[in-house]
């Protein structure tokens, strides 16, 4: 066993990592809009990216360098996704990275990550002009987390110290952005994780894949998959300590915290809902049903209206394509059972109890399909007027 | 070849069909809420139903009678879906149908169709008490179309006379409802088609399947599939005339008109958009991409905002899982090309032209994937404040 302690510092918490946010004039009013994460020690990087076929230029640039490679620096910009920009998008990154390496000769294979407008060239000159403000050793994780925000209502960071039974320890830190856009682009999710654990480089990608399955792949704000979605893990081995079970658990905790923060901070959203599906024929079927619930417009608007509309829950499961049977299905809001294998328990009393569950900021809706042992929990949010406003009225 | 003339009368236009709407007290203020369609001559019925696993009781009742069978009457009610009601839901229908046959001995295998709240018992006594108002011979198609409306902003009916080159003719008529609900239930689509063409009974289901593919299966209001979706075809052979090509064409025209009316009348929607996808690797891929566009929240809110946000269109195609390549893709709003195989044509002038296309009530967005010959057109609508209001605020 091991102990896990929340600590301050975000991506700068692990030994040897620095980060900061600077203002390059991409956002208005001198707001922070460019961030970097740097390791003072040699580090390895591995990442998982969007499945969108039109993966943005920074993703294709990263993939050109390999799966896991030496890298001690990532430059992140808001306001421009550098997506649908073709070969020029890559050239713009190469141009910037050359200037960055010229200015900071200690950088090894610097990479980029972007979020913002799709289909416009990267404002590389503006970014280049701001590189002079970068001080590599700055430990300003909170400013970095702030710089990468777009329509995020709050910045998202987390860090843990992991103590093994023999007293040795390592740290893991991370920051993320989600929410969406204020400009016409897709809602992009970016997450940067740092650790001083001595992670074997051939394990980095697989561990990321394991952890993303129940965290970032389990959330949905609007069901769309951006051209820029990225989860990036930097490991500099500075602690010299590693224990896989402990590291994976800590990685999952970090990613779970940030993923639920991203869902909670869905554009205009006020509520975080955990859709627990159990009793499915398989885990795949549980995933299918749980994700159908997170993306159903009728379910999302019912959550916004704090309406325990179990008929919409049932119908969404029925149309999700999974094996189900109305005489085996059970539906609960929190601990309030409203439908029990063919019996409609929903009366005025139960309705009021279920509605009071939904008035909370965070709650669960549980569907037991009663078929098999497959289970999965997906996280979603409500959809209200603010969502429409953010996504339709950005011009005004 | 043949000629097709629009005529009045809706479902009552074909010879020997009658219909009416009555008020059973299910809706408030004495509004019409129960409808029937009847054939004075012996008729056959065939239907296509929802793929939702929790198909409503009236659907399971119908399926218990066969695929194509003798039937000269359908009773339709609004305000209650009779879904998630188990064996009792079927018993309620049997009870009502017995009373109906007792009152009108000429009825053969009467069936039901319902739309409204999921998970509440059918108010069968109220409906039974109103059966006395039914006059079998009434030709009030418009009142029937009105009775089946829920949140529909307008009633939907259509009829054509089909004239063959030799002067013989037959008629086809139909009515539909869509839009959604004012009560907490799924947005249900119901469509009833009548014809006096001499359709061979063994062709009825296949012809319905062909016609539904490019019509009702090509529309999306909210991406949810209701427990009650139904397309029902009655044929009484009264004209003695049939020519398959002409009949199929007329059937498709009727269903296309009603399906686009349903999409146009999506809850709170103001615009009908045809998403034309061409150049896909296969028709399946074209369907996948076109449907992804109709259900993308970011695309739907951009349409509401009249924002020619081609980046969202591209990204939705990229995440739809179809084969695509940014150097082959072309995107147009109406006739305005905004992205051409890697070249971003979008400047202030093009943006204004594309925005003016989007200010129309009805327009197309065309995506040529440039990969193969697969094509498909799906129909969708915008998503604005009204949608949220209808679906979240029904209590207030």
From Swiss-Prot, chains A, B:
Pfam families: ArgJ (PF01960). Gene3D superfamilies: ArgJ beta chain, C-terminal domain, L-amino peptidase D-ALA esterase/amidase. Disulfide bonds: none annotated. The record marks 187-188 as: Cleavage. Its main location: cytoplasm. The keyword Cytoplasm applies. Pathway: Amino-acid biosynthesis; L-arginine biosynthesis; L-ornithine and N-acetyl-L-glutamate from L-glutamate and N(2)-acetyl-L-ornithine (cyclic): step 1/1; Amino-acid biosynthesis; L-arginine biosynthesis; N(2)-acetyl-L-ornithine from L-glutamate: step 1/4. It is found in: Cytoplasm. InterPro entries: Arg_biosynth_ArgJ, ArgJ-like_dom_sf, ArgJ_beta_C. GO terms for molecular function: glutamate N-acetyltransferase activity; L-glutamate N-acetyltransferase activity. Substrate binds at residues 150, 177, 188, 267, 391, 396. GO terms for biological process: L-arginine biosynthetic process; ornithine biosynthetic process. The record marks 115-116 as: Involved in the stabilization of negative charge on the oxyanion by the formation of the oxyanion hole. The active site is at 188 (nucleophile). Belongs to the ArgJ family. Heterotetramer of two alpha and two beta chains. Catalyzes two activities which are involved in the cyclic version of arginine biosynthesis: the synthesis of N-acetylglutamate from glutamate and acetyl-CoA as the acetyl donor, and of ornithine by transacetylation between N(2)-acetylornithine and glutamate. This is Arginine biosynthesis bifunctional protein ArgJ. It comes from Wolinella succinogenes (strain ATCC 29543 / DSM 1740 / CCUG 13145 / JCM 31913 / LMG 7466 / NCTC 11488 / FDC 602W). The gene is argJ.
């Amino acid at each position: 066993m091991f102990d896990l302690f929340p600590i301050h510092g975000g991506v700068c918490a692990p030994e040897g990592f620095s980060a900061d946010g600077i203002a390059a004039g991409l956002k208005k009013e001198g707001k922070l809009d460019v961030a970097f994460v740097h390791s003072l020690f040699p580090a390895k990087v591995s990442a998982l990216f969007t499945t969108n076929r039109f993966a943005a230029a920074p993703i294709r640039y990263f993939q050109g360098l390999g799966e896991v490679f030496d890298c001690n620096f990532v430059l992140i910009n808001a306001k421009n996704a550098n997506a649908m920009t073709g070969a020029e998008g890559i050239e713009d990154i190469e141009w910037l990275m050359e200037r960055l390496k010229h200015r900071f000769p200690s950088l090894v294979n610097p990479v980029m990550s972007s979020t913002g407008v799709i289909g416009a060239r990267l404002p590389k000159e503006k970014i280049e002009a701001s590189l002079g403000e970068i001080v590599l050793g700055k430990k300003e994780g909170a400013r970095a987390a702030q710089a990468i925000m777009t329509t995020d209502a709050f910045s998202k960071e987390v860090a843990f110290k992991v103590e093994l039974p023999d007293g040795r320890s390592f740290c893991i830190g991370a920051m993320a952005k989600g929410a969406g856009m204020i400009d016409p682009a897709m809602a992009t999710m970016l997450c940067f994780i740092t650790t001083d654990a001595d992670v074997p480089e051939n394990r980095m990608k697989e561990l990321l894949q394991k952890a993303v399955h129940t965290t970032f792949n389990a959330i949905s704000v609007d069901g769309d998959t951006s051209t820029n979605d990225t989860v990036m893990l930097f490991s500099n081995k500075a602690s010299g300590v590693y224990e896989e079970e402990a590291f994976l658990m800590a990685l999952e905790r970090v990613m779970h915290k940030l993923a639920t923060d991203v869902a909670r901070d869905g554009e205009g959203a006020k509520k975080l809902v955990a859709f627990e599906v159990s009793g499915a024929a398989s885990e795949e079927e549980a995933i299918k049903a749980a994700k159908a619930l997170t993306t159903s417009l009728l379910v999302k608007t019912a959550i916004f209206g704090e309406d325990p509309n179990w008929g919409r829950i049932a119908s969404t499961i029925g149309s999700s394509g999974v094996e189900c049977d109305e005489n085996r299905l059970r539906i609960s809001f929190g601990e309030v059972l409203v439908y029990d294998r063919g019996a409609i328990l929903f009366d005025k009393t139960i309705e009021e109890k279920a509605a009071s569950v939904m008035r909370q900021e965070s709650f669960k809706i549980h569907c037991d399909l009663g078929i098999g042992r497959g289970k999965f929990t997906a996280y979603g949010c409500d959809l209200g007027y603010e969502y429409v406003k953010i996504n339709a009225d950005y011009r005004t």
